[in-house]
Amino acid sequence: VQSVGEIESLIQHFPSVNFVETHLVGDVFGRPKSVRLRSLLDLITDGPSMIINSDIEITTSTEVFTGYWGDLQHNSIKMGVRWDCSRRFNVPPALLKYGIDVFLLSPETARMLPDLGMTIGCPAWDYWIPWHLNRLSVTIHTSKRIEFMHEVHEVNWSKNEYDIGIRIMQDNYPNLTSPMLGSFIQELTGRTALKLRKIPV
């Protein structure tokens, strides 16, 4: 899924990819070329589908991957936490302390998520999905298996975008605080006591 005008420049580099054009962009964050999460959720109509960040490498075999991700129970979602590595600095994989990069959703759970302006690649979208669905009693499963690898790089979003994401959450969920949200995600993903080594970028 790409914003209007982006597909023409991308298709020559990725001729086998089936691009879908959308007008739903990250205008709330001032990102007219980034797509809103809603544009992806609207495509989940025929069965469970995976939303995954574009810079994630899946390292497991097809058989192993589908063994876990190929099944989704009613009224539930599956989430995947990435592992960061740095081949450039020869740093081994380390489980990401914050953030979630992979979501397996059914058409039913996708419809439960309203369009609040959340945008792929901008802060809070990955925290918002489980926060909202948890309030609707959706069962959430988290995988921390070493299968989603990510080469570390500089952060692509700003402090202002972070503040916008948190403000969207607080405007829609009264009394929610940033520490409360962070604690919820840490407990949900079982990373409350995780200590990560510093990875150079």
What are the language-model segments listed below?
Residues 8-11, 41, 62-70, 129-130, ...:
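Short amphipathic alpha-helical segments and helix-helix/interface helices
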Residues 1-6, 47-49, 56, 69, ...:
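Preference for well-ordered, secondary-structure-rich cores of eukaryotic proteins
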Residues 119-201:
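C-terminal catalytic/acceptor-binding lobe
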Residues 2-52:
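Active-site-proximal specificity loops/subdomain of glycosyltransferases
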